[in-house]
Amino acid sequence: MAHKKGTGSTRNGRDSQSKRLGVKRYGGQVVRAGNILVRQRGTKFHPGNNVGRGSDDTLFALIDGVVKFEYKTRSRQKISVYPVPQEEPATVAG
C-alpha cells in the first residue's frame, strides 16, 4: 500500500477567480458618463456613438443618456448612448 499520495494531487486543486464579465447596463437604461456598459475579453460588442473603449476592451459611456444596442453589420453588435431630450420647465401664464 502506498504511503504517499499520487503526484497528481499536488498539481490539481486550484481554480481561478471569476472575472465578472458581461453586460452591466442593458438597452433602454439611463446611464451617467463613465458608467461601465460591458466588461469583455475581445470585442464581442463594439463601441458606437458616445461610447469609449478601455485598454481591456471594457465599454463605457462618454455622456449621460440612454443605452441602445445596435447592429453594425449582420454579425457585429455595437452599443451606443444617446442623450435624453431635456424637458423645458413649464411656464405659468399669468
Swiss-Prot record:
GO cellular component annotations of the record: cytosolic large ribosomal subunit
Any one of the GO BP annotations: translation
One Pfam family per UniProt: Ribosomal_L27
Record region (Disordered): 1-25
The keyword Ribonucleoprotein belongs to this UniProt entry's keyword annotation: yes
Signal peptide: none
Gene3D superfamilies: 2.40.50.100
PROSITE patterns recorded: RIBOSOMAL_L27 (PS00831)
Keywords, in A-Z order: Ribonucleoprotein, Ribosomal protein
GO molecular function: structural constituent of ribosome
Record family assignment: Belongs to the bacterial ribosomal protein bL27 family.
Listed NCBIfam families: L27 (TIGR00062)
Name under which the protein is recorded: Large ribosomal subunit protein bL27
Annotated organism of origin: Gloeothece citriformis (strain PCC 7424) (Cyanothece sp. (strain PCC 7424))
